[in-house]
Amino acid sequence: MLEKLIKNFVAYMGVASELEFDADGSYVFPISSLVRMRVRQNADEEIIISAFLGEIPASMDIEKAYARMMEGNLFGQETGGAALGLDSDGHAVLVRRVPGEVSQEDFASYIESVLNYAEAWLEDLGLSKTEQE
């Protein structure tokens, strides 16, 4: 089901490139030059949408950045129901879990929502000025 959702979404977006996979088998979405998005299904059949925001530079006030992320996470009010966090390499990520059985329209809405919030958080945290992986 996930593969079909992704292929339909990529076709809808007009992305001509082949779908890529990363080391953990996640689909890598080539839909934004600022945000690297990944989509996979977990063992509970939920769809996990993640947006890589980048490394918080050492020149930033790390405690202030972390506090801002925690404020944004409160009740999902500034994340659209997603969660901000750090991956094992210390990079900021935005992650959203959605039901595995989702319509094509809802899937597209979830992807667009995560992308929009991710781009807003890039700006909020000042990461849009740093180089993304």
From Swiss-Prot:
GO terms for biological process: protein secretion by the type III secretion system. InterPro entries: Tir_chaperone. It holds the Pfam family CesT. Belongs to the chlamydial CPn_0713/CT_663/TC_0034 family. This is Uncharacterized protein CT_663.
